[in-house]
Curated annotation (Swiss-Prot):
SUPFAM superfamilies per the UniProt record, alphabetical: YbjQ-like (SSF117782)
Matches recorded under Pfam families: YbjQ_1
Record-stated family: Belongs to the UPF0145 family.
Protein name as catalogued: UPF0145 protein Bphy_3680
Length: 111
């Protein structure tokens, strides 16, 4: 498994040299809101502020997509991912796709 400090939103890893680019990797998750969750979130909007039900749903979806991307990179033999990004698209009413993607690389520590 790829160590968390070996994932970067930039295209370099401080203290490391990229030896090989192994290709694009991604993790995709599709989530829907439950009826109960939608009602609870609707009640929270009345009072304003953070809608905690949606926040936790979004955090969980991003974490799951991230884990899938790391597994994809590990299958290619990567020990790092650079240029990592998230994207989200609403597919339908209450259904959202979360994509986590980046470039799988093999990097070595500078001596």
């Amino acid at each position: 498994m790829i160590e968390r400090h070996m994932v970067s939103t930039t295209f370099d890893l401080p203290g490391h040299t990229v030896d090989a680019s192994l290709g694009m990797v991604r993790g995709i998750i599709v989530r829907s809101r439950s009826v109960v969750g939608s009602i609870g979130a609707g009640l929270q909007t009345i009072f304003g502020g953070n809608i905690s039900l949606y926040t936790s749903l979004c955090e969980r979806a991003r974490q799951d997509a991230y884990e899938r991307m790391l597994a994809d990179a590990a299958m290619l033999g990567a020990n790092a991912v650079i240029g990592m990004r998230y994207d989200a698209t609403e597919i339908g009413a209450g259904v959202t796709e979360v994509l986590c993607y980046g470039t799988a690389v093999h990097a070595r520590r500078n001596v």
